[in-house]
Regions:
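Bacterial Sec-dependent N-terminal signal peptides
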Residues: 1-27
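Feature recognizes metal-dependent phosphohydrolase scaffolds
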Residues: 23-304
Length: 304
């Protein structure tokens, strides 16, 4: 190597050493892959009778099991976000409940649990609706939950699965569990995720689908699509946030309202408003112009 080549090589080494720290400082670090949080299970049923069970365990591992057919007594365990084993659930048949019930001796009513597992479970235990193991002990009485399980908290699935489980246990005991659609059900399933915790959208992203798509294909999604928005129990009418004068002026019957809301549950805001004059658009109108009134109500706990 001659002297000219040597000087050029030294110059390049010095040039590299001078610029490397600057480039490294300006370059954005590669974002680390975040561990998934405990969630699920989401049971995705296919038309051919097969099923896919998706969940995340306590170590953040994605569990994705496929079943060629669904066993008649298929059951699974439900865990809270902090890893506590809560209760087992057995799948049962799902259909739309009647919109009108006879008044039982007692009716326990609450609303807006917003994925707060400890609060929701504590209320039901204090009201003698469930025992320490989350089993139905309310006899032939009725539990009414007026919507809004989604958003704000981290235990959406445990609350929905408990309601689903209690529905069958109450029926077997001569009682009833009623879950009504609230505005946060319509928001999340319509892909308005502004109040949805990151753990849920992160799981959907990992699976290559949107969060509403994950629900639409699931057992709980099918169950939600068959829930009513208005329910009459004896002389009491229950709805998430009241009924507007405009709604009353339209003289809808309750079964029609329940069907319209269910039909639009998994549609986006744009799809719901495609025909501005339609019943569908009216039912999903926002606060201040609301037809059915599925917006804004505080959590309550009432025993009648």
């Amino acid at each position: 190597m001659n002297s000219i080549q040597c000087r050029i090589l030294v110059f390049l080494v010095l040039l590299t050493s001078c610029f490397s720290p600057v480039c490294g400082k300006d370059k954005k670090p590669r974002q680390a892959i975040e561990k998934l949080s405990i969630d699920g299970p989401y049971l995705l049923k296919a038309d051919d009778g097969s099923m896919r069970a998706i969940s995340v365990d306590g170590k953040g591992r994605l569990l994705d099991k496929h079943y060629k057919s669904i066993p008649t007594t298929f059951s699974f365990e439900v865990f809270s976000d902090n890893g506590e084993r809560l209760f087992p659930v057995t799948i049962h048949s799902v259909s739309r409940p009647k919109w009108k019930d006879v008044q039982p001796e007692k009716t326990f009513v609450l609303s807006d649990p917003h994925a707060n597992w400890s609060c929701f479970a504590s209320l039901l235990k204090a009201g003698k609706v469930i025992d320490a193991d989350y089993n139905w002990i309310f006899g032939a009485n009725q539990l009414v939950i007026i919507g809004d399980v989604f958003d704000r908290g981290v235990d959406v699935l445990p609350i929905y699965w408990l309601i689903y489980k209690l529905e069958k246990e109450a029926e077997d005991a001569g009682g009833k569990v009623t879950f009504l659609i609230g505005n946060h059900e319509t928001m999340v399933l319509g892909n308005d995720l502004r109040y949805t915790k990151k753990k849920y959208t992160q799981l959907a992203d990992t699976l290559g689908m949107t969060y509403p798509e994950l629900w639409q294909k699931s057992e709980l999604g099918h169950w939600l699509k068959t829930r009513n928005s208005i329910q009459v129990v004896g002389d009491n009418l229950f709805v998430h946030a009241g009924l507007s004068k405009e709604f009353l002026d339209r003289n809808y019957d309750i079964p029609t309202v329940n069907e319209i809301v269910s039909d639009g549950l998994f549609l986006t805001k744009k799809e719901r408003n495609a025909d501005k004059g339609s019943d569908l658009s009216f039912m999903f109108a926002t606060y201040g112009r609301s037809g059915i009134g599925v917006w804004y109500v505080a959590q309550i706990s009432i025993i009648r």
